Design a protein with these regions (language model features):
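Conserved helicase NTPase motor core
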Residues: 11-22, 26-30, 41-42, 54, ...
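Conserved helicase C-terminal RecA-like lobe
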Residues: 171, 224, 363, 377-389, ...
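Conserved SF1/SF2 helicase motif Ia
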Residues: 49-65, 82, 253-254, 360-361
């Protein structure tokens, strides 16, 4: 039965794909061109480990770059190895896996200023603290915009720089300002017992590097490491993989069974610290690396591949590969250079009408129009409306980005961590309790005087001497609500608590 399953896993794969699936020991670099079946290869490789090599599923780690990719990988593996075996594997994004590690190793976070109940702040929460830091430093928000400060701080973290290191390496004055904001921002994070997404990576790397025994536990657990979209790894992510697979410079205890799948030609996250050099340096950092090139494209015709190859060949830092396809030459690529965006929109609408009239397409849903920025949709939409072409713009706010969901999560986070000032400020007047900015400012001042969190200051608000009667009553009502909810945590189910 085992041999039958093994044969099934290799059926339908081309020769390079088979090599990628069956090369299971030691470091492996799979260079996968677009449309070359890399997702199928990585899932079949994991299944091959379980079914043919008889590796326990819980020893397998698979890292993806999006939650969607993680879900799809798990669904595929459920079909290949079974639901129970798939559940035993660790599959997720770098951030999700690091968050899990930090929860397990929470006792080790105390020296870093965090308790077990730490919360994770999203980009909106980060922006709130960035603004607080800027105002606390009396910096002009119009000149040094919070969004710019946030991006510079995130980039510094992706380069594994602390505030002092960022200040030392600053080339422009705006970077010096950002380093000052960074220092206060980190202090505010810790006072809220919170971490941001970048901290998840940095803190995990720091714990593993400083505690060899902790690192060794994870090396023994995850003996087979897989990384998808490897070209998009930033420095902390790369270091995490090297620690797991190789170890520290003075302790090489990793088994080296690291399989990375990527394509330096497809790197899209350079703004987030990703570097194509990761692909180039992998062979240096992991001795005796085996390289497999997936060069057969199953998605496009040769004309499209040749055009793409002509463009990407100009990149100097890349692994050389030549994609080919069995789908034939295909139609030539048509290029239209418009004078402006209005002309571009007019041409696009006219071309859709032409394709429909000629019968090249059966229905409008066969057409997709892609653009680089949201601002470009205006000219297209105007032309579609004028020419009576029905259309649908894809893309709306994600579930967890909706205001009502973020508000509900803020309530839950505050209940779990009363030191979370950011969450308290978000929901103190949601729904409307007639607690305005002036009252909130009074509460913040009261908390500073008490040298405590906003939640603790709220519990003592009755002792405030200058606060108006209506404002004090509104704050006391909110305080009582939170106390009641905290008291009900142990007794109620989550759904009942939300009701």
């Amino acid at each position: 039965m085992m041999m039958l399953e093994q044969v099934n896993l290799l059926n339908g794969l081309n020769e390079p794909q088979r090599k990628a699936v069956t090369t299971t020991q030691g470091p492996v670099l799979i260079l996968a061109g677009p449309g070359s079946g890399k997702t199928r290869v990585i899932t079949h490789r994991i299944a091959y480990l379980v079914q043919h090599e008889e590796i326990s599923p819980w020893r397998i780690l698979a890292v993806t770059f999006t939650n969607k990719a993680a879900r799809e990988m798990r669904e595929r593996l459920e079909k290949l190895v079974g639901v129970n075996e798939s559940k035993e594997m660790t599959i997720g994004t770098f951030h999700a896996i690091c968050a899990r590690v930090l929860r397990v190793e929470a006792d080790s976070l105390a020296p870093l200023g965090l308790s077990k109940s730490f919360v994770m702040f999203d980009t909106d929460d980060e922006a709130t603290l960035i603004k607080q830091a800027i105002r606390g430093l009396n910096i002009d928000e119009k000149q040094y915009r919070p969004g710019v400060m946030q991006a510079l701080i995130s980039r510094a973290k992706n380069d594994m720089l602390g505030p002092e290191q960022m200040a030392e390496q600053a080339v422009k004055y705006v970077e010096e300002v950002a380093a000052r904001v960074y220092k206060v921002y980190q202090r505010l994070l810790r006072s809220n017992n919170a971490v941001d997404f970048d901290d998840l990576l940095m803190l995990t790397e720091r714990l593993w590097r400083r505690d060899p025994e902790m690192l060794h536990r994870y090396q023994r657990k995850w003996q087979y490491v897989h990384v998808d979209e490897f070209q998009d790894c930033n420095l902390p992510q790369y270091k995490l993989i090297r620690l797991l697979g190789y170890g520290t410079d003075d302790r090489h205890e990793g088994l080296g069974n690291v399989c990375v799948v990527g394509d330096d030609d497809q790197m899209i996250y350079s703004w987030r610290g990703a570097s194509s050099e990761n692909v180039l340096r992998f062979e240096e950092d992991f001795p005796r690396t085996k390289v497999v090139i997936l060069d057969q494209n199953y998605r496009s015709t040769q004309n499209i591949l040749d055009a793409a190859q002509h463009v990407v060949r100009r990149n100097r830092q890349r692994k050389d590969k030549q994609l080919w396809t069995a789908l034939g030459t295909g139609e030539k690529i048509f290029f239209y250079e418009a004078f402006n965006e209005e002309q571009e929109g007019e041409f696009t609408a006219r071309e859709i009408q032409r394709l429909l009239a000629r019968g090249d397409i059966e229905k409008l849903s066969d057409v997709a129009v892609m653009y680089r920025t949201n601002a470009q949709s205006r000219a297209l939409e105007e032309q579609f409306l004028r020419q009576n072409i029905p259309y649908k713009v894809i893309g709306s706010r994600k579930f967890y980005e909706r205001k009502e969901i973020k508000d509900m999560l803020a309530y839950l986070r505050l209940l779990a961590n009363p030191n979370d000032d950011v969450s308290l400020l978000r929901i103190i007047n949601v729904p409307n309790r007639k607690i305005g900015p002036k009252t909130v400012g009074e509460l913040q001042q009261w908390a500073r005087q008490q040298n405590t969190s906003l939640y603790n200051a709220l519990q003592r608000i009755s002792a405030h001497q200058t606060l108006g009667k209506a404002a004090k009553m509104a704050l006391e009502t909110f305080s009582q609500l939170m106390q009641d909810l905290r008291g009900a945590i142990e007794e109620l189910q989550l759904t009942e608590l939300l009701d």
